[in-house]
Swiss-Prot record:
Name of the featured protein: Outer membrane protein P2
UniProt record, GO biological process: monoatomic ion transport
UniProt gene name: ompP2
Species for this entry: Haemophilus influenzae
Family in the record: Belongs to the Gram-negative porin family.
GO molecular function: porin activity
Length: 353
């Protein structure tokens, strides 16, 4: 029997969560371990500042380990804790760098705790994903062309509330704190000072719909503030008989910058996911994004396209081929138009545990 696309998405694209192993379950306490080892072989070419760069690599692609602990408190209440690691490469000054094999030092990606109730929702505290992370439907494994963080932060050190009391519906709200340096306890220029966001996502009855709004304050130079008011939206429909999902993702943001130019930006991104055969899926999306400088007349336009195909060799083994191409044109008042191009193709393997 042919699988529905919704089942494929849960089974193939979220395998790490679905296949988490329960290592302890006694007297209301459950401990689950999960994660994946993920490798990609890629070839990339970029043309920036009139220089062409080309390189191939074999590197880590988001390998991780996570542990989740849940305690049943009775009367429908529970407490939870979650911890997830990543690998990170750093230079001699401790700055993160996307270089080498990608298997550097182990670092904390997510770490939070909380209290919840099946009917009332869940409150969590710590380093975690926000509701904005859910507001897109387009699929990708590595070269995602949609950069949601430019509109609303998708993770951070936050207080969050999530409600899932209605089947298929997720409601979320969060307040994100700024990260301070250990040396002087100040927020680094360009980093989030604080942010607030609300959103909702519905995925049931063949319909996908979501919306999020956020207001984010960034630390700018000379102790000034940069404020971004952003919105993200997604809409999709499952054609189960065809094994097809079509979607449209979009975003809009307005930046008020007391230290520099103001900006407006938006993007639209139609996409699809199609079941070629059992355990084999084709996916892709296009993106058009535009950024306008309100004060100085600078305009940036980006066209991007992504296609990929994945195949499950086993319920815990996924292979894929993915490629992306992006072209960015920058028009600055009184200057010659600049064009930058970037293309990448990769072959990946994920082994979940």
């Amino acid at each position: 029997m042919k699988k529905t696309l919704a089942a494929l998405i849960v089974g193939a694209f979220a395998a790490s969560a679905a296949n988490a192993a329960v290592v302890y379950n006694n007297e209301g306490t459950k401990v689950e371990l999960g994660g994946r080892v993920s490798i990609i072989a890629e070839q990339s070419t970029s043309n920036r500042k009139d220089q062409k760069h080309q390189h191939g690599s074999l590197r880590n692609q988001g390998s991780r380990f996570n542990i989740k602990v849940t305690h049943n408190l009775g009367d429908g209440y529970y407490a939870l804790g979650y911890y997830e690691t990543r690998f990170i490469n750093k230079d001699i000054d401790g700055n993160e760098k996307n270089i080498g094999s990608g298997f550097g030092s182990i670092t904390t990606k997510l770490a939070y705790a909380g209290l919840g109730n099946k009917e009332l929702g869940e409150a969590t505290f710590g380093l975690q994903k926000t509701i904005a992370d859910k507001i897109s439907t387009a699929e990708d494994k590595e070269y995602g062309v949609i950069e949601k963080n430019s509109y609303i932060p998708t993770e951070g050190n936050a207080i969050a509330y999530t409600y899932k009391g209605i089947e298929g519906l997720t409601l979320g709200a969060s307040y994100v704190f700024g990260g301070r340096n250990f040396s002087d306890y100040e927020i680094t220029d360009g980093k989030v000072s604080n942010a607030v966001q609300v959103g909702a996502k519905y995925d049931a009855n063949n319909i996908v719909a979501g919306f999020a709004y956020g207001r984010t304050n960034y630390k700018a130079q000379q102790a000034k503030t940069q404020q971004v008011n952003g919105a993200l939206a997604t809409l999709g429909y499952h054609f189960d008989d065809l094994g097809l999902l079509i979607s449209l993702d979009s975003g809009y943001a307005k930046t008020k910058n007391k230290a520099d130019k103001h900006e407006k930006r938006y993007f639209v991104s139609p996409g699809f996911q199609y079941e070629l055969m059992e355990d084999t899926n084709l996916y892709g999306n296009l993106k058009y994004e535009r950024i306008n400088s309100v004060d100085q007349g600078e305009k940036v336009r980006e066209h991007a396209v992504l296609f990929g195909i994945d195949h499950k060799l086993h319920k815990q083994v996924l292979t894929y081929i993915e490629g992306a191409y992006a072209r960015t044109r920058t028009n600055d008042k009184g200057k010659t138009e600049k064009t930058e191009k970037e293309k990448s193709v990769g072959v990946g393997l994920r082994v979940y545990f």
